[in-house]
Swiss-Prot record:
Descriptive protein name: Histone-binding protein MSI1
Origin species: Saccharomyces cerevisiae (strain ATCC 204508 / S288c) (Baker's yeast)
Domain of life according to the entry: Eukaryota
Principal location: cytoplasm
Record's function text: Acts as a component of the histone chaperone complex chromatin assembly factor 1 (CAF-1), which assembles histone octamers onto DNA during replication and repair. CAF-1 performs the first step of the nucleosome assembly process, bringing newly synthesized histones H3 and H4 to replicating DNA; histones H2A/H2B can bind to this chromatin precursor subsequent to DNA replication to complete the histone octamer. Plays a role in the maintenance of heterochromatin. Independently, MSI1 is involved in regulation of the RAS/cAMP pathway via sequestration of NPR1.
Something else known: Present with 149 molecules/cell in log phase SD medium.
Amino acid sequence: MNQCAKDITHEASSIPIDLQERYSHWKKNTKLLYDYLNTNSTKWPSLTCQFFPDLDTTSDEHRILLSSFTSSQKPEDETIYISKISTLGHIKWSSLNNFDMDEMEFKPENSTRFPSKHLVNDISIFFPNGECNRARYLPQNPDIIAGASSDGAIYIFDRTKHGSTRIRQSKISHPFETKLFGSHGVIQDVEAMDTSSADINEATSLAWNLQQEALLLSSHSNGQVQVWDIKQYSHENPIIDLPLVSINSDGTAVNDVTWMPTHDSLFAACTEGNAVSLLDLRTKKEKLQSNREKHDGGVNSCRFNYKNSLILASADSNGRLNLWDIRNMNKSPIATMEHGTSVSTLEWSPNFDTVLATAGQEDGLVKLWDTSCEETIFTHGGHMLGVNDISWDAHDPWLMCSVANDNSVHIWKPAGNLVGHS
């Protein structure tokens, strides 16, 4: 089961010796492995990360959505926040006159003014209750951010109302625009579920519909999948307690949900009971396709391919990665790969249709796969504890962000000669 790092202590002594040695070896080889690498250490680990779709071309500044996870030690520090980082793409590198023969690389002009080497916190939003398991911005309006909470609710925030001068105020008043919270729904699945644990419920994941603005999908540890329309929000009643649809799974926790990118009604869900299911918002209660025979140990993540939405990837706690043709999910996967240990999440590249990234929940590795040949093409080994989330950048095709339980936030780009980019 994906525990979201909640049983991990963050002391250096908790890091196994072999991982410390692996990190030391990795660090010595970073100049050969990366075209760009920026490592940051934060006060608290983040359970989520996502590059924003915008880019400041004058400074090559990227924005990243992150969170603070305190494991209930300091609830007042539980936040979602937006940080900025420049990858220095705007800097004009100097001529051969400034080629450094010792390091065998070009250096910028001495007069060049560099931006901060570290993440700069731009806006912080106090998370009102519980811990933020996953945060994602609305694709049609990135100022709107949804956070899945360990208290079972989904909180919706408006970034424009949380400037730096309002942080203190936001902690006093309600920082959220809308709260989505409903244990009952209008539709129930035909399969029974164990309701004895319904009082112990977390919102484990969420996903925005790319085709219908304001349509939000959420998964829950009590076995429910819920679909929300945040356009039901009103200033007088900011709490929406009735989802459009509430579907019970196979009786076990739902770990992840994802919309088909090219369709407004089809979505997939994966469960602790090893099920990967395809569902249709229009039918509301029937699974179109489902398979629970090809995974073990609980399926932690599932994602549709952006370029070919008939391909669905899923990964489980034993490290198995399956690729499905959703037209034949009752059959064997079209491809199977092994990450090695439990996979916390996976993400298809939005730029290359066969490239997929998996995040190791236990080994701390992010692996990039070429699924056309079912081979690993790059491994990021800079984290010393489990990786919680990963994100691809929309502007730089190979740029990634990854966050881990060792309080690290890494922004990195593999060397072109290793993955085949110029």
